[in-house]
Amino acid sequence: KYDPKSRVYMNGGVVIKQSANQKYTTDAVSEAVTKMLCEKAGVPCQVFANHADIPGGSTLGAILNSLVSVTSVDIGMAQLAMHSPYETAGAKDTAYLVQFAKTFYETTLVRTEHGFSLEEK
């Protein structure tokens, strides 16, 4: 259930989930900011999109975002057999996600005349 042009790989970095049907909270702004944060953190990132003719699941974030509008992004790690008794994920991806989160919490997002900039807190 993925678009072959946006295939993701285990140990390939943080995965940004996007959906044209807005099943995920990711939009152009949140995706761009996430990519900026990944670059700042020295963490690779990948983009996942559902296959165009096969609707995928959704996340709680998309449901909550319909009630309270907050800029957000759906991120995670590439996995095999999600929600099964034996999920498989890359060990490097855990470290990447931790480094991304650390950078996120140490950074202030500043809106500028020409877009956004990231500054140390």
Label for each model-derived stretch:
Residues 2-84, 112:
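Active-site-adjacent substrate-binding region
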Residues 77-121:
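His/Asp/Glu-rich mid-to-C-terminal helical/loop segments that flank catalytic regions of hydrolases
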